[in-house]
């Protein structure tokens, strides 16, 4: 079973994987029955999670077999639950590259006017290139755009586009892979071979690997940055049970 999951996750195109995830849900509760780990998003317990990631960034016991959440999804969910997100007044939400684990939840929230966007995802309402968003200025109260900026040619241009379509007083979360051992972002446009990109940037289709300067890059695009640190902002958090990355922070990008 583990071999089958790994093969599917690493070889199938994302749109097809999204469709097949509904089948995974039928198998997971039986194949991974247990209570060693817990996913706060689907609120299910399992014997273990699945492994995930490239050979360079491989992690064991991180992928929920039911809703396919990873460490970053579970951390974002914990932030949203402790904030006023689900109880706030009507929110215009733009969700770029919508994650399968969040899509059905956000879709049914009565306080969310929910718009999804992507290059090709079958989940998306809109399809566009993030470098030039075909929407007016000051439209959205909240924008989620997670694990996208490491894939784009000009991340600063994309950040300024996110800033442009966000309302004044709005906020967004744009998670990216971060090497917390590096002070600065590493990118080299001469590295084009997929294997070399995986070696340098942790994945074959990544164009850069962000460092601890990532929030400064968001500031350069105009955002004010607030930091959610689960170690200090959440009490009695069981990192091991939920299989979270103890170093990961959530940067909230605010348009003043």
Summary of predicted features, one role per range:
Residues 147-151:
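Short catalytic micro-motifs in class I SAM-dependent methyltransferases
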Residues 142-143, 162:
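Alpha-helical membrane segments in multi-pass integral membrane proteins
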Residues 90, 140-141:
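Local beta-strand N-terminus motif with an aromatic residue
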Residues 96, 143-144:
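Hydrophobic beta-strand segment of the Class I
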Residues 3-6, 24-37, 153-163, 167, ...:
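S-adenosyl-L-methionine-dependent methyltransferase catalytic module, highlighting the catalytic core
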Residues 2-134, 229-256:
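Conserved N-terminal segment of class I S-adenosyl-L-methionine
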């Amino acid at each position: 079973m583990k071999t089958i999951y790994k093969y599917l996750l690493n070889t199938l195109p994302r749109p097809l994987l999204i469709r097949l995830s509904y089948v995974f849900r039928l198998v997971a509760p039986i194949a991974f029955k247990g209570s060693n780990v817990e996913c706060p998003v689907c609120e299910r317990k399992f014997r273990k999670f699945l492994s995930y990631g490239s050979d360079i960034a491989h992690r064991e016991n991180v992928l929920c077999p039911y809703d396919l959440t990873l460490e970053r999804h579970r951390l974002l969910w914990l932030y949203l639950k402790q904030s006023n997100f689900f109880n706030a007044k009507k929110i215009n939400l733009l969700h770029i590259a919508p994650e399968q684990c969040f899509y059905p939840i956000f879709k049914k929230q009565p306080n969310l006017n929910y718009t999804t966007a992507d290059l090709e995802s079958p989940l998306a309402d809109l399809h566009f290139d993030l470098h030039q968003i075909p929407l007016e200025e000051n439209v959205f109260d909240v924008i989620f755009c997670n694990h996208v900026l490491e894939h784009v040619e000009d991340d600063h241009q994309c950040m300024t586009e996110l800033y442009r379509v966000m309302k004044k007083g709005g906020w967004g979360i744009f998670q990216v892979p971060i090497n917390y051992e590096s002070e600065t972002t590493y990118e080299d446009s001469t590295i084009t071979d997929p294997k070399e990109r995986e070696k340098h940037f942790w994945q074959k289709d990544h164009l850069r690997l962000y460092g601890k300067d990532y929030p400064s890059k968001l500031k350069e695009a105009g955002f004010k940055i607030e930091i959610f640190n689960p170690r200090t902002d959440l009490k009695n958090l069981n990192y091991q049970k939920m299989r979270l990355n103890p170093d990961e922070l959530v940067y909230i990008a605010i348009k003043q």
